[in-house]
Amino acid sequence: MTYSTVNINTPPPYLALASNEKLPTVLSIAGTDPSGGAGVEADVKTITAHRCYAMTCITALNAQTPVKVYSINNTPKEVVSQILDANLQDMKCDVIKTGMLTTAAIEVLHEKLLQLGENRPKLVVDPVLVATSGSSLAGKDIASLITEKIAPFADILTPNIPECFKLLGEDREISKLRDIFEVAKDLAKITKCSNILVKGGHIPWNDEEGKYITDVLYLGAEQRFITFKGNFVNTTHTHGTGCTLASAIASNLARGYSLPQSVYGGIEYVQNAVAIGCDVTKETVKDNGPINHVYAIEIPLEKMLSDECFTASDAVHKKPVKSSLNKIPGGSFYKYLINHPKVKPHWDSYVNHDFVRKVADGSLEPKKFQFFIEQDYLYLVNYARISCIAGSKSPCLEDLEKELVIVECVRNGLCQHERRLREEFGIKDPDYLQKIQRGPALRAYCRYFNDVSRRGNWQELVIALNPCLMGYVHALTKIKDEVTAAEGSVYREWCETYSSSWCHEAMLEGEKLLNHILETYPPEKLDTLVTIYAEVCELEANFWTAALEYE
């Protein structure tokens, strides 16, 4: 028999600076969903995901899954009272969030709010009346009790459309945004809660871009509406979205954000959780599955394993990665990527773009090219930053040095753009470049880069950076003999830069780097690299489209 001793690391030094961290605290008063998608369980996950400390007061023990509510077992009034007393006596509480409330819970909470007076925490009320599955979670008089006893104390009320109708005591036709405004204003009067968030998930709208969701925040004290337009996700898996949104808003308020900021943050968090989704139900569950509350949470062990000073190698052995290169036809990962069904449509749109053709024949309007140069300048600054991050994640000195070479090349590209703006477009203001604003296409691209750099590994980050060089050189080399822009013009000079022998050599090095990436990446995760390449090619095409459409 053998044994070994594994030394446990102390907290990372920087994290240790936050020892005895003061966490914002949120108390959830709601029923349970033992399947984890809604109720108190969803609240605790959401509050934790926002780096807040979650406390609970369970109003009912429910036998519930995304399929339906099988039974509701209300917590006795005296137990609810004891739980609230204990929590409010011994624990700090920045925000209270309510979900499913029973008659007993409403009466107890009403008494506590009166007792607390001006010292009461902020209150976010999600008037849970019906589960997403359609099951009733409240008696017919609960709506009136919430209106009378709880809502007047609330900082914000977050009903969906059906819940608005129950609280108003009548159904209404919703055919335009103004109808939702009227619902919000009338609800504020009836409930005596000045801030109302009407959730629009039940009534998606349509425009030229397709379906979208509109949530409306009414700020009564300011007599102002804020509409939040979000993407419509074509999914039926939305179990627990209401609970999650209210808890996210409560957590943001606990962290000191303003109400509009807190609502925005909550909406985006929920939409991300819906869009990313999770596979946790059995195949028999076809509709109303849970959302992914933990999409932004890091796995502690992954950080430990990536720590160069990790001390527990005896306990955790890294499996050697089997190369996938021998499975790639022709031995070129680059050619495999650009011909992959997921990548090819975006690659073709990118390298055959009209922007390149218009630059090549000199027909592009100067203002559009100036816009491109300005946006590309900001893009290259971000590209350099991301390359530095890639270098910091690289496994060896050789790979780090490659990123430093790339940064130097980017610096040269920035100098060329500065010269073009100065000589071709008469820009003399030395602060001009600092005043340029990112357009929507560039914002989307930079957001993608920043997210991969924050969450991805070295291989994934290199894959994200690769299409820029490969696509430009491919596109300009392809039409090298068709360039008719005037000799000495900025258009011809730009075309000749990317069709030069130097850029072609850099492209060959990029192809070698892609093969190196494939040799060191887990084969079972290959689709991740393919998806990243496809999405970045689409972003590149959109970047050129933005220049063509600039007015």
Swiss-Prot record:
Gene3D superfamilies named in the record: 3.40.1190.20, Heme oxygenase-like (1.20.910.10)
Reaction equations catalysed: 4-amino-5-hydroxymethyl-2-methylpyrimidine + ATP = 4-amino-2-methyl-5-(phosphooxymethyl)pyrimidine + ADP + H(+); 4-amino-2-methyl-5-(phosphooxymethyl)pyrimidine + ATP = 4-amino-2-methyl-5-(diphosphooxymethyl)pyrimidine + ADP
Pathway the protein takes part in: Cofactor biosynthesis; thiamine diphosphate biosynthesis; 4-amino-2-methyl-5-diphosphomethylpyrimidine from 5-amino-1-(5-phospho-D-ribosyl)imidazole: step 2/3; Cofactor biosynthesis; thiamine diphosphate biosynthesis; 4-amino-2-methyl-5-diphosphomethylpyrimidine from 5-amino-1-(5-phospho-D-ribosyl)imidazole: step 3/3
Source species, domain of life: Eukaryota
CDD domains on file: HMPP_kinase (cd01169), TenA_C_ScTHI20-like (cd19367)
This protein's record includes keyword Signal: no
Enzyme Commission code: 2.7.1.49, 2.7.4.7
GO biological process: thiamine biosynthetic process; thiamine diphosphate biosynthetic process
A GO molecular-function descriptor: thiaminase activity
Broad enzyme group: transferase
Entry keyword annotation includes Transferase: yes
GO CC annotations on file: cytosol
Record: residues binding 4-amino-5-hydroxymethyl-2-methylpyrimidine: 64
Induction trigger: By absence of thiamine.
Family designation: In the N-terminal section; belongs to the ThiD family.
Function, in words: Catalyzes the phosphorylation of hydroxymethylpyrimidine phosphate (HMP-P) to HMP-PP, and also probably that of HMP to HMP-P.
This protein's name: Hydroxymethylpyrimidine/phosphomethylpyrimidine kinase THI21
Native source species: Saccharomyces cerevisiae (strain ATCC 204508 / S288c) (Baker's yeast)
Gene from which this protein is expressed: THI21
